[in-house]
């Protein structure tokens, strides 16, 4: 775990920061789609500005694969979601169906219900591994600068959560492909 800050965050926000160690990456995590040229250039521009402000800027990235991030969402979120939905359905008398849940939510529920406790335990092991990899990475830097999205913002409707025929693996991959740099932080717990 990281140590508590020496001063409150509010106090820190009112003063110029000390010289920061800022890692940056324009390369998507292994297995993820390549970031769009506009997104990569924005990172390079921001890195250059940080360097001009006196920070120590260097290229670097944690060794977390895109599949690790996707698998956590798929194999941890789905069974947790299934348990929560079952509880709410029991309390409300509603059932899981198209009138209450989008197609991709139903696909995640099906995936979660089909998992064994052993599979969930293995997925939680991936959460721990991702957390440790990120922790090691941040011992060498204070900030990691990346694109938020792998491409410019998508038009409304491209990520259609009610798309029939999309299974849990496909849906999670589709979502994580949009923001592959952020996915690992959600996957770390």
Predicted regions and their residues:
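A short helix-breaking turn/cap at a secondary-structure junction
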Residues: 1-45, 64, 87, 91
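Short helix-loop capping/hinge segments that flank enzyme active sites or metal/cofactor-binding pockets
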Residues: 11-27, 76-135, 147-151, 156-160
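Flexible loop/turn segments at secondary-structure boundaries
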Residues: 30-32, 66-67, 152-155
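Short gly/ser/thr-rich secondary-structure transition/capping motifs
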Residues: 2-8, 124-132, 174-176
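Conserved short alpha-helical elements in the N-terminal third of ANL/AMP-binding
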Residues: 184-185
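Acyltransferase
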Residues: 35-62, 85-96, 120-141
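Short, surface-exposed loop/helix-turn segments at secondary-structure junctions
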Residues: 1, 71, 76, 122, ...
């Amino acid at each position: 775990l990281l140590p508590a800050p020496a001063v409150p965050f509010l106090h820190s926000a009112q003063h110029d920061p000390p010289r920061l160690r800022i890692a940056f990456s324009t390369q998507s995590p292994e297995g993820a789609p390549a970031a769009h040229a506009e997104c990569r250039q924005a990172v390079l521009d921001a890195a250059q500005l940080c360097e001009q402000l006196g920070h120590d800027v260097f290229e670097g990235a944690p060794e977390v694969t895109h599949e690790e991030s996707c698998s956590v969402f798929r194999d941890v979120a789905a069974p947790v979601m299934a348990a929560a939905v079952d509880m709410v359905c029991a309390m409300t008398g509603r059932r899981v169906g198209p009138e209450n849940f989008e197609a991709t939510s139903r696909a995640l529920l099906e995936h979660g219900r089909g998992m064994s406790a052993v599979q969930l335990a293995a997925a939680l092991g991936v959460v721990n591994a991702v957390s440790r990899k990120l922790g090691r990475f941040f011992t060498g830097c204070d900030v990691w600068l990346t694109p938020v999205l792998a491409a410019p913002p998508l038009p409304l409707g491209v990520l259609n959560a009610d798309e029939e025929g999309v299974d849990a693996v496909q849906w999670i991959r589709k979502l994580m492909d949009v923001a592959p740099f952020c996915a690992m932080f959600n996957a770390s717990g």
